[in-house]
Design a protein with these regions (language model features):
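C-terminal accessory regions of radical SAM enzymes
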Residues: 2-13, 17, 22, 133, ...
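Residue-level signal for short, function-critical loop segments
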Residues: 9-10, 60, 237, 265, ...
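Catalytic cores of alpha/beta
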Residues: 92-99, 272, 333-348
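Radical SAM [4Fe-4S] cluster-binding motif and immediate context
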Residues: 157-324, 344
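Conserved strand-turn element in the central/C-terminal portion of the radical SAM core barrel
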Residues: 238, 291-296, 300-302, 313-338, ...
């Protein structure tokens, strides 16, 4: 069969989920292509490929773009349309929003998609395929979840070539990304993992990780085919139940490229930090989220002591690692003084980059349910009019419109202010303006530049210009689309 994966924006990072499914399908003998709809000649190229399947990976917010694009494409392309990704996993009822959505994949797609396509290709009945809600002759059939993939080492390595054939800039960028594990045992209220673990109750362990050797073998293959000078390990929490010493030994000997990974402060100790340093880790991402005890532990359910985070940051910096924190403001019931605690915590610890997000209560998360229960959502908010991105606006109720604007603008200057705290008086003046696209652009470009100071990757001028152009297209093609709750 001929499968077309379709992305409604110019991807600025590799879509690893799609890349993993591509190789599974190729191994089954299918023909697979990846398309980005804003690119020149998209429809003509897609028609020339003549796909049997249109496939979309959706997140909440992007689901609207995918659905609308699919409806437009189906006017001239006769194909079966299937959707997967986080939005579909937590809201499979999405299939009911369009008669042209033929299938929704819930959870892991590795064997779900190969089994479904095998049955379709062989003209077998497929209405009882695990992990799928499917529409056949106008009727929707709902199926159970299959067990999790336990042996991640048995899965094929991601196919990046199909992605790079459409997005040459991703091929050329010196930064590559990899997934070393699946699953997270923590129950943060704003994150999908708690609900995901509930969906998979009795279907396998919460966390599975690849062996260090398997990770290294994939990295060696990437390095051979697509030379890179920096690696991002994008696991929710890197190294859960992994042999740090073995990884450090193999990575330093076989790969030797500086990398960044996500860590949880209560899981760190001096031995693990030294292993990370030995392996070649130069920076870590750590979720602070909030320095206010009530917001952090009661609202966001982080269950972390502030001292634990402080000690972890201190230990990391003492070992020469750069610290990249993630922070959330505009939380339900949060005052500006509480948000300033988070700002001041980052300033106090001289973090290298303090990324900031506006709280978006995604459907299916605990914090969404709490917002509904306690009337923290703005009137009329639903799945299809939630803010396009947590970098834009907020759908949380504030004490006043003025207070809401204050939070939205503070977000745009949060990371800049942490690096330049003496300019806080100026930032407070800017916060009095109405939220606007200029502030959004400043935030996106400053944060992008600041990340380069974390990873410190050298790029030749042609690649640098390409990266800038790719990010500009992504900003204007996705973030700055009109949104009824972003005020833009």
């Amino acid at each position: 069969m001929r499968i077309a994966f379709i992305e409604p924006a110019i991807a600025h990072v590799e879509p690893l989920g799609i890349a993993s499914l591509v190789q599974m399908l190729l191994n089954d003998g299918h023909s697979v292509m990846y398309f980005e709809s804003p690119r020149k000649g998209f429809v003509e190229r897609l028609k020339k490929f003549n796909p049997d399947i249109l496939a979309y990976s959706t997140t909440t917010g992007k689901h609207r773009l995918c659905r609308d694009l699919n409806e437009e494409l189906r006017k001239s392309i006769k194909a079966i349309s299937i959707f997967g990704g986080p939005h579909c996993t937590f809201y499979p009822e999405f299939i009911e929003s369009s008669a042209l959505i033929d299938g929704i994949c819930i959870g892991e797609g590795d064997f779900a998609i190969t089994e479904l396509l095998k049955r379709i290709e062989n003209k077998e009945e497929y209405i009882k395929t695990d992990n799928w809600w499917v529409r056949v002759d106008g009727q929707i059939y709902k199926n159970q979840i299959r067990n999790k993939v336990e042996n991640l080492d048995a899965l094929p390595f991601l196919n990046r070539e199909v992605i790079y054939a459409e997005n040459e800039q991703l091929r050329r960028t010196p930064i590559k990304r990899i997934i070393a594990s699946r699953g997270c045992p923590y129950s943060c209220s704003y994150c999908f993992n708690k609900t995901y673990n509930f969906i998979y109750s009795g279907k396998g362990r919460v966390n599975y990780h690849r062996s260090p050797l398997n990770i290294i073998e994939e990295l060696k293959l990437i390095k051979k085919n697509y030379p890179f000078s920096f690696l991002k390990i994008v696991d929710d929490t890197f190294g859960l139940n992994m042999d740090y010493e073995e990884f450090a030994r193999l990575y330093s000997q076989e790969v030797g490229v500086p990398f960044l990974c996500n860590v949880r402060p209560n899981l760190l100790n001096q031995d693990k930090i030294k292993c990370l340093k030995k392996a070649g880790c130069v920076a870590v991402t750590m979720a602070v989220e909030s320095a206010n005890d009530y917001v952090r532990n009661k609202v966001l359910c982080r269950n972390l002591d502030l001292k634990v985070m402080s000690d972890a940051i201190t230990a990391l910096k003492e070992n020469g690692l750069r610290v990249y924190t993630q922070n959330i403001i505009g939380n339900p019931g949060e005052t500006f003084a509480m948000a300033m605690e988070t700002f001041n915590f980052n300033v106090k610890h001289c973090v290298d980059f303090a990324e900031c997000f506006l709280l978006t209560p995604f459907y299916g998360t605990e914090i969404y349910e709490n917002c509904v229960k306690n009337n923290f959502l703005e009137e009329g908010i639903n799945m299809d009019n939630m803010p396009q991105s947590y970098w834009l606006g907020s759908c949380i109720k504030f004490s006043s419109l003025k207070e809401k604007d204050k939070f939205i603008n503070f977000h745009k200057f949060f990371s800049f202010g942490v690096q330049h705290p003496r300019l806080l008086p100026l930032i407070k003046i800017l916060m009095k303006f109405s939220p606007n696209k200029l502030f959004v652009l400043f935030n996106r470009f400053y944060d992008s530049w600041r990340i380069t100071r974390i990873i410190r990757v050298k790029m030749d001028i042609i690649i640098l210009i390409g990266v800038v152009k790719m990010n500009v297209k992504y900003i204007f093609g996705f973030f700055l689309k009109t949104d009824s709750h972003s005020k833009f």
